[in-house]
UniProtKB/Swiss-Prot annotation:
One of its GO terms (cellular component) is mitochondrial outer membrane. GO terms for biological process: nitrate metabolic process. This is Mitochondrial amidoxime-reducing component 1. It comes from Xenopus laevis (African clawed frog). It catalyses: N(omega)-hydroxy-L-arginine + 2 Fe(II)-[cytochrome b5] + 2 H(+) = L-arginine + 2 Fe(III)-[cytochrome b5] + H2O. Residues 45-343 are cytoplasmic.
């Protein structure tokens, strides 16, 4: 309201208007500061954009979250990419872990039938299902009175809150195991994540994970899968390789050269290739481990350069590990841009 309007106002109306103006002053100042911050950010982004080239190299075709390590994936259409990987509501990538009573991780390498377990969320309840098993429901959040276990994932120490006896009994029944297993949950607000570089030294200090093998993000292209399957007598699926992000619209193994990528609002930095192990030989439909294919075939054409043998040993390379450079939302259908510096 302008001063001209106020100039003809009677005393009480003018006083009330001035009082309102005084109350609005802090809000107007805050709004001004906010606009300044936004303008500064937009200027910085513009300068960054001027210094970089974006080349579309593919499309996000799938986003997959694995709530429990070594169990089935949950496909989502949209996910937040946090420093610890993909998340969508209660779904957080590999934030649940099966361990022994001593806290040692249990994966499909030891219990191949883990790949048949599905973990979904119904409201504030984690639901576990497996073949010939009744569903077990675990209310969330877990009670703070539940004990916190000291666990080990590839020799690294990390904590997890125990989910209780009902889940433990369900796992023992499913695996028909005389050894008791526990299901634990990583609570990011009170527990310290693992550092990726303690598993693979090529990672950066800031790359952190909960219970994944090494990286917050693993990306694989559909065309790389097709190239592998063209060499196999019995085709395998993406489920054998457990990527978080699947790309399409590119040449086979193009992801090997995507050192810096943008997907939606998210920016990822390629760290290293994913060296493959015996876990890839677990059939995701039967839960049977063969220890043969597709690993044997991968070894015939996806070995590392001799200069990198110290890093990868004899593991064939399939898919790429990424660190999270900038968090944000990723959606199925988003373009995948390779980012390069100008000049």
């Amino acid at each position: 309201m302008s001063n001209t309007v106020f100039s003809g106002a009677v005393g009480p109306l003018r006083a009330a208007a001035l009082s309102i103006s005084r109350h609005r002053l802090p809000l107007l100042c805050a709004a001004g500061l906010g606009l300044t911050a936004v303008a500064s950010w937009m200027w910085w982004r513009k300068r960054q954009g001027e210094a970089e080239d974006l080349q579309q190299v593919g499309i996000v075709s799938q986003l997959l979250i694995y709530p429990v390590k070594s169990c089935r994936a949950v496909p989502v259409q949209e996910a937040e990419c946090s420093a610890l990987g993909l998340k969508s509501g209660h779904l957080e990538d590999r934030h649940w872990l099966v361990v022994t009573e001593e806290g040692n991780m249990v994966t499909a390498r030891q219990e191949p039938r883990m790949v048949l377990i599905s973990a979904t969320f119904c409201g504030n309840t984690l639901c576990l299902n497996g073949p010939e098993m009744q569903e077990v429901q675990i209310p969330l959040p877990l009670p703070k009175s539940n004990r916190v276990l000291d666990c080990r994932v590839f020799g690294q120490d990390i904590q997890g809150r125990d989910s209780g006896e009902q889940a433990s009994e369900w796992l023992a029944t499913y695996f028909q195991s005389s050894q008791p297993y526990r299901l634990v949950h990583f609570e990011a607000d009170v527990m310290r994540p693992r550092q990726s570089k303690k598993k693979e030294k090529l990672f950066r200090d800031k790359d952190v994970i909960a219970y994944p093998d090494a990286s917050p993000i693993m990306l694989l292209s559909e065309t790389s899968m097709e190239a592998l399957n063209s060499r196999l007598e019995q085709p395998v699926s993406l489920a054998n390789f457990r990527p978080c992000i699947v790309a399409s619209g590119c040449e086979a193994f193009a992801e090997d050269d995507w050192d810096d990528v943008r997907l939606g609002a998210t920016r990822l930095k390629r760290v290293m290739a994913c060296g493959r192990c015996v876990l890839t030989t677990v059939n995701p439909n039967s839960g049977v481990i063969t220890r043969k294919e597709p690993l044997d075939t991968l070894r015939t054409f996806r070995q590392s350069d001799s200069s990198l043998k110290e890093v990868y040993k004899n593991a064939p390379l399939f898919g790429q590990y990424y660190g999270v450079e900038q968090t944000g939302i990723i959606r199925v259908g988003d373009p995948v841009y390779r980012v390069t510096r100008k000049g």
